[in-house]
Amino acid sequence: MTKGILGRKVGMTQIFTKDGILVPVTVVEATPNVVMQVKTVESDGYEAVQLGYQDKREVLSNKPEKGHADKAKTSPKRFIREIRGVELKDYEVGSEVTVDTFKEGDVVNVTGTSRGHGYQGNIKRWGQSRGPETHGSRYHRIPGSMGSIINRVPKGKRLPGHMGVKKVTIENLVIEKVVADKNVLMIKGNVPGAKNSLIVVKTASKAVKADK
């Protein structure tokens, strides 16, 4: 069954494994999440667990948010996300989900919001090649042809525009270390998002089994 937790991306560092191998890891701080709601097929049409992360000041919370938090006997939360495919009997409204949910060696999917890069051209945004810089060339970094047949720009045409700030999921990352007393997960490799951004860690659904 799926397990999940919400956390904050702290940054990257390096650790040594038991075999003495240096591994780059991303540090994710996941303070205890509160189960805000348990959704069932009978009441909501699907099964899911709603987790809340990071307290939100009362002055910034409206009445519906306060009422929803009161049902879980907690304060309003800044981030609320749903985790599907879980074992509902393992969760109760108001209970906490901690990093102990995972263990070293677990394979997970990590979802975050990619870093924003503002308005960018084709070369940086899509990785296209530039034209010649000299010898009379008039084609340097411009997008190029829009198409030669239809009298409009086709859908999906790669053009300059806003880059980043997209929901990105990286699959099949390995948890190298769990530091329960500091509410920290160390995940091998990099994860999407800027420092201090929200990260959702869930059990990988398409994990590749290791050969015995």
UniProtKB/Swiss-Prot annotation:
Which cellular component, as a GO term, is one annotated location? cytosolic large ribosomal subunit
Q: Where is this region: Disordered?
A: 119-147
Q: Which UniProt keywords apply?
A: Ribonucleoprotein, Ribosomal protein, RNA-binding, rRNA-binding
Keyword Thylakoid found? no
Q: Name one GO molecular function term.
A: structural constituent of ribosome
Keyword Transmembrane present in the record's keywords: the answer is no
Q: How does it assemble?
A: Part of the 50S ribosomal subunit. Forms a cluster with proteins L14 and L19.
**Protein name stated in the entry:** Large ribosomal subunit protein uL3
Q: What is the native source organism of this protein?
A: Lactobacillus acidophilus (strain ATCC 700396 / NCK56 / N2 / NCFM)
